[in-house]
From Swiss-Prot:
Subcellular location(s) of the protein: Membrane
Cellular component aspect of the GO annotation: excitatory synapse; synaptic vesicle membrane
Name used for this protein in its record: Potential vesicular glutamate transporter vglu-3
Alphabetical list of Gene3D superfamilies matching this protein: MFS general substrate transporter like domains (1.20.1250.20)
Molecular function as annotated in GO: L-glutamate transmembrane transporter activity; neurotransmitter transmembrane transporter activity; symporter activity
Biological process annotations from GO: neurotransmitter loading into synaptic vesicle; regulation of synapse structure or activity; sodium ion transport; synaptic transmission, glutamatergic
Glycan attachment positions: N78
Transmembrane segments: 50-70, 105-125, 128-148, 155-175, 194-214, 220-240, 286-306, 324-344, 361-381, 385-405, 417-437, 451-471
Length: 544
């Protein structure tokens, strides 16, 4: 690496540290639009009602995702229920067939990320969010029915799971679209983290709730229960939410003014899909800082979420019943830290104690560093108490990153936040290969967990350094420019110009130069004709 590049990287890190510990009072551009809102209980504010209801929506979605993972234990194995009755396996699926049915969900989930971001930027994001959970809820009920369609059960279930993945894949980009209209700049962290912590609550409650329903009733009960709950939630969401404060039914005038004036025009103008700054987005180092951190976060999250029970069983020799209860604590700790960090970040920014960039980099560095340190310890620890403590600290500390890179989309490009979220989540879904890597390295080899944790630690460290160097906290220049609305006639005109240009080049090669003169006199230059038309009129007015 050239000396200049090394010097620039060192300066970027030094500037971040200097901003973090400086006593300077930072004046945020958002504070220039000072509006006094009447103090009232936060649940009476519509934006907080939306945040809390979105929290439950994410919880339902992650509960739905846990249903099949729990139900399969009774479907493909001999099972003793809560009443002591033994049930024989109902389905003779192989491990490969079950794996194909489960993985089909993630294929649909990854495929819908980027299209969901574009749709959330173009249409009402609150309706897209609702449709995602509504479709997934219907698919959940259909899943319970589809398991009985022999002999094509596996194919039918794969299709249903893929559609369910497509539906739930729109949630994160759509929610970023919702906050684009509803979250004032200095409340983004706490509103967004309140909504997104629903995913941890869904994991924390979905697994034991599904296990209870499977054990006390049947394997199909969780599918029906979570499906019905999701449908009921969709009806409530449609009443509470709306596209923007201007279209809401019962929002107070005070809150409407508070939200719309603080957000300003940067987030309320429509955009043309043909004129989105795709090149600027994909060549922006700040955007790639978010994408890289999304990948790193997904790698660690999938590792700790999907494999911690297996790790406890194979390495720590903890019984599955006990490990299932223990797994609640990491998710609970993550929720607490995520909510607390969101409040802290907005306080530091609104009080002027730290700049937006310093806040994002600080909490991001803290979360990834704590997780990396604990994963490094897990590579060498074999004592169950110490190992479980490291797991809890790793998950708990990592909760702060949701107030770092995960809301940085709003800081650098608020109008394109749902699109950036879709791009980051879509590319970050590549981290799903981590499950395959983990299974390959640890198959009949408990010592392989050492290398799994060391690899995850290295990925976290890379994410910390990349974000420290390249992340930004202000709106980027290409995100400030108003979008050009291209009508159908303008599109046809642009295409006709290109066609005539190609035709002109062809004629020039053949020696026909009269076409250039003909094009100059054509209607392709309307501005000059208007000027010529105005000239006689101006002369006549001056003479009169």
């Amino acid at each position: 690496m050239p000396n200049g590049s090394i010097r620039n990287c060192a300066n970027a890190v030094a500037d971040t540290v200097r901003q973090t510990f400086s006593r300077k009072t930072w004046e945020h551009k958002e504070q220039l639009q000072t509006i006094t809102e009447q103090k009232k209980f936060f649940l009476r504010k519509v934006r907080w009602q939306i945040a809390i209801l979105a929290h439950f929506g994410f919880a339902i979605s992650f509960g739905i995702r846990s249903n099949f993972g729990v139900a399969k234990n009774r479907m493909v194995n001999n099972f003793t229920d809560a009443y002591g009755e033994v049930h024989e396996r109902e389905f003779l699926w192989t491990g490969a067939e079950v794996g194909m049915m489960e993985s089909s969900f993630f294929y649909g989930y990854a495929a819908s990320q980027i299209p969901a971001g574009v749709l959330a930027a173009k249409f009402a994001p609150n309706k897209i969010f609702m449709l995602g959970i509504l479709v997934a809820s219907f698919m959940n009920i259909l899943s319970a029915i589809s398991f009985n369609f022999h002999p094509y059960t596996d194919i039918f279930v794969m299709v249903v799971q893929a559609v369910q993945g497509l539906a739930l894949g729109v949630l994160y980009p759509a929610m970023h679209g919702v906050w684009k209209f509803w979250a004032p700049p200095l409340e983004r962290s706490k509103l967004a983290t309140t909504a997104f912590t629903g995913s941890s609550v869904g994991v924390m409650t979905g697994l034991p709730a599904s296990a209870y329903l499977v054990s006390h009733f049947s394997w199909s009960t969780p599918f029906y229960v979570f499906g019905v709950v999701g449908i009921i939630w969709s009806l409530i969401w449609m009443y509470v939410s709306s596209h923007s404060p201007e279209t809401h039914g019962y929002i107070s005038d005070d809150e409407k003014k508070q939200v719309t004036e603080k957000i300003g025009d940067v987030a309320v103008k429509n955009m043309s899909l043909t004129t989105l700054p795709w090149r600027d987005m994909m060549t922006s180092s700040a955007v790639w800082a978010i994408i890289i951190c999304t990948f790193c976060r997904s790698w660690g999250f999938f590792l700790l979420l999907g494999n911690q029970l297996t790790y406890m069983k194979d390495v720590l020799h903890i019984d599955i019943k006990n490990s299932g209860f223990i797994s609640i604590f990491p998710q609970f700790g993550m929720c607490i830290v995520t909510l607390a960090t969101g409040q802290l970040c907005d306080y530091l920014r609104s009080s002027g104690k730290m700049s937006t960039e310093a806040v994002r980099k600080s909490v991001n560095t803290f979360g990834f560093t704590v997780e990396a340190m604990m994963l490094g310890c897990l590579a060498f620890v074999r004592d169950p108490v110490i190992a479980v403590t490291c797991l809890v600290i790793a998950c708990t500390g990592s909760g702060s990153v949701l107030s770092g890179f995960n809301v940085n989309h709003f800081d650098i490009a608020p109008r394109y936040a749902p699109i950036l979220m879709g791009i980051a989540n879509g590319l970050g879904a590549v981290a799903g290969v981590g499950g395959m890597v983990t299974n390959t390295v640890t198959y009949q080899n408990p010592d392989g967990w050492k290398w799994v944790f060391l690899l995850a630690m290295a990925i976290d460290i890379f994410g910390v350094i990349f974000f420290l160097i390249f992340a930004k906290g202000d709106v980027l220049p290409w995100a400030r420019e108003p979008e050009k609305e291209e009508t159908f006639n303008e599109f046809v005109r642009r295409m006709s110009i290109k066609v005539r240009s190609l035709s002109r080049k062809t004629r020039n090669r053949e020696g026909d130069t009269s076409y250039e003169k003909m094009e100059e006199d054509s209607e392709m230059k309307p501005c000059s004709k208007k000027v010529e038309a105005r000239a006689p009129a101006e002369k006549s007015e001056s003479s009169s």
